[in-house]
């Protein structure tokens, strides 16, 4: 498992008992996003703030800059997310504050893919229809965009997300996460800094859900891949879980020393195992689908 902090990338091979600092070949830029090649797990990608993309072929031991086509990166530019084409691990989409980029050769060359995104200032997140991978969704500072041709062209899909008088603005709605239901491909969830939304018609229209949540600033979201209708969201109020597709919510913070949760992830091998990254209080793990959490101190490792 890899963990990116404000300072370094860490890796554990023993479920968090010991950690190794992985930084050889990287700048001191903050790592914002990481991704593991689904075919060759020793190949790892890191997206940074200010220094574009790095790639490692040996499990993070050595890193190489992969910024060809990302040359307009500035010190404030952020790589937010990697998204793999399930049919080709060399084909990757990138969500950045400069827009959407695509590579077809594992990061050797990146191409900007922003046709139709006229008002967008930044792209925060990308989602893919698992049943129809040519369909992509982009969560941006201006709301949601959809592509039906693998980012060849984008169309704004903000009906119900924001008031009509704000539909054309570049900061209509800051979307932080967008996910497609693996059981119902036309059902899409969009988390934002102003609440949670759901579409049942492929983003043609949206409805607000989760209005009972005390804090409407949603930072991260996960759809349980093995349990239909189960959603996890995080923010300044901790972790919430819904077991009825967003109709009702349960706060699941037992064991957390802080409620400011910045990210959440479900294990690829154990569906009951979840990880939560906090803002300044380290990493937590749950072995019971979020009912209880335990701290995972990053100590006992080596550089």
PLM regions: where:
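Extracellular glycan-interacting surfaces
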Residues: 1-303
